[in-house]
Structure formats: C-alpha cells, structure tokens
Amino acid sequence: MVMREETIKSLEDPYKYHYKEEWLNTKDPDEQQLFEIFAFGNIKDLPENIILTSLMRSKLEKLTLVTLSEIYNELSYELIKEECQIEDDGIIESHLIQLQNIFKAEMDSVSKSMKFSRRFDCRDVYCHEKELTIIKNPRVTKEYLVQNLRSWETKLKQNILE
C-alpha cells in the first residue's frame, strides 16, 4: 500500500486523534481502510497486510488506550499491554503522559496500574454515514450515545430532581 505524504503526516501528527472527516472524504480505498481503523478501530483491528510507520503504530496504540479509557475506570498494565500490543511499561507511561489532553490518569508504577479521574475527549462516533469495511462492531455509535444519554436523563429525573 502506497500512502500519500499528506496521509502519513495526518496519521503521524502527535496532536491529532480524530480521523472521521478524512475517512468520510477520501476516495482512495486503501486510505479509507486506514482512516477507518484510526477513526473507529484499535490496534487489534489492523490487518496484517497494512504496514504502519513507527509513529503511526504509536498513534494507534494511543487510540486503543483512549478506547480502554472509555470502557474502564481502572486498568492494569498487563491489560494495556495485551490490548495495545505493547511490551514495555515505559511506553505505557509515555503514552499516558502524551494523552493528558484526552484524559487525566493517575499512574501507579509499583502496582502497575492506573486510574482515570477525568476525561476530556473521546474517540470518533460512527453514525452509519458510510459502510465500514474493516471494523465489524464499532464500540461507540450514535445509537449507543443516544441510549446512554436517555439512561442518564432517566437517572437524573428519578434520583436527583425528585
């Protein structure tokens, strides 16, 4: 797969974590698959035939970590290593520091765990604008968000406002 320089720069940009717009706008099928993975997928979704630069791989590890932060409040380094396919604790800690504008996390190097205390951003939301070709079951969909908001609204009305 040959990637345009513009695509490589976008995927390697250390401050960019949202790729839905690129996924929607690209006409190239190979780039579309790559942007799909970066917008909605995790490192385990990456097909073996797609080779990433080290910076792109690092970005996908971080995006996978953002996904984990949306699911769990507390994580062990072992789970992070498994899900992000990272072998070194130092890389995990470096990623956590680099993601400080996405979430606030407290690291415990002794117990090799971490806790998320605040979240400032999340992954892209799939709203069925286009058919997915790589990701089978996107975690965050428009329906998922609407359901959670309705649930929260019900809880608010029943438990807090009464």
Swiss-Prot record:
Other remarks on this protein: Present with 358 molecules/cell in log phase SD medium.
Name used for this protein in its record: COP9 signalosome complex subunit 9
GO CC aspect terms: COP9 signalosome; eukaryotic translation initiation factor 3 complex; nucleus
InterPro entries: Csn9_fungi
Organism the protein comes from: Saccharomyces cerevisiae (strain ATCC 204508 / S288c) (Baker's yeast)
Gene label: CSN9
Location of the PCI domain: 6-118
Signal peptide range: none
Main location group: cytoplasm
Gene Ontology biological process terms from the UniProt entry: adaptation of signaling pathway by response to pheromone involved in conjugation with cellular fusion; cellular response to pheromone; conjugation with cellular fusion; cytoplasmic translational initiation; protein deneddylation; regulation of protein neddylation
Function text: Component of the COP9 signalosome (CSN) complex that acts as a regulator of the ubiquitin (Ubl) conjugation pathway by mediating the deneddylation of the cullin subunit of SCF-type E3 ubiquitin-protein ligase complexes. The CSN complex is involved in the regulation of the mating pheromone response.
Alphabetical UniProt keywords: Cytoplasm, Nucleus, Signalosome
Compartment(s) where it occurs, according to its Swiss-Prot or TrEMBL record: Cytoplasm; Nucleus
Domain of life, per lineage: Eukaryota
The keyword Nucleus belongs to this UniProt entry's keyword annotation: yes
Cysteines engaged in disulfide bonds, as pairs: none
Subunit structure: Component of a COP9 signalosome-like (CSN) complex, composed of at least RRI1/CSN5, CSN9, RRI2/CSN10, PCI8/CSN11, CSN12 and CSI1. In the complex, it probably interacts directly with CSN12 and CSI1. Also interacts with RPN5.
